[in-house]
UniProtKB/Swiss-Prot annotation:
<keyword id="KW-0165">Cleavage on pair of basic residues</keyword>
<keyword id="KW-0964">Secreted</keyword>
<protein>
    <recommendedName>
        <fullName>Dermatoxin-A1</fullName>
    </recommendedName>
</protein>
<dbReference type="Pfam" id="PF03032">
    <property type="entry name" value="FSAP_sig_propep"/>
</dbReference>
<keyword id="KW-0878">Amphibian defense peptide</keyword>
<comment type="function">
    <text>Possesses a potent antimicrobial activity against Gram-positive and Gram-negative bacteria. Probably acts by disturbing membrane functions with its amphipathic structure.</text>
</comment>
<keyword id="KW-0929">Antimicrobial</keyword>
<keyword id="KW-0732">Signal</keyword>
<dbReference type="InterPro" id="IPR016322">
    <property type="entry name" value="FSAP"/>
</dbReference>
<keyword id="KW-0044">Antibiotic</keyword>
<feature type="signal peptide">
    <location>
        <begin position="1"/>
        <end position="22"/>
    </location>
</feature>
<keyword id="KW-0027">Amidation</keyword>
<feature type="propeptide">
    <location>
        <begin position="23"/>
        <end position="42"/>
    </location>
</feature>
<comment type="similarity">
    <text>Belongs to the frog skin active peptide (FSAP) family. Dermatoxin subfamily.</text>
</comment>
<dbReference type="InterPro" id="IPR004275">
    <property type="entry name" value="Frog_antimicrobial_propeptide"/>
</dbReference>
<dbReference type="GO" id="GO:0005576">
    <property type="term" value="C:extracellular region"/>
</dbReference>
<dbReference type="GO" id="GO:0042742">
    <property type="term" value="P:defense response to bacterium"/>
</dbReference>
Length: 77
């Protein structure tokens, strides 16, 4: 009877260890996927931010050029 208990314990142990290892690998894979998703989102946010900054600088440059042109016209007249 003790032999059967030991055998059953061994079978359960050998069955649970690989299951535990697979669950850990699955969690690690999910964590890596989440990190990649977060990095992609940060890159998209940074791209949108840079696009907005570029548009803002273009607008400011246009305003400065217009004002500078007006000053030159006023100085010549």
């Amino acid at each position: 009877m003790a032999f059967l208990k030991k055998s059953l314990f061994l079978v359960l142990f050998l069955g649970l260890v690989p299951l535990f290892l697979c669950e850990n690998e699955k969690r690690e894979g999910e964590n890596e996927k989440e990190e990649n998703d977060d990095q992609s989102e940060e890159k998209r946010s940074l791209g949108s931010f840079m696009k907005g900054v570029g548009k803002g600088l273009a607008t400011v440059g246009k305003i400065v050029a217009d004002q500078f042109g007006k000053l030159l016209e006023a100085g010549q007249g």
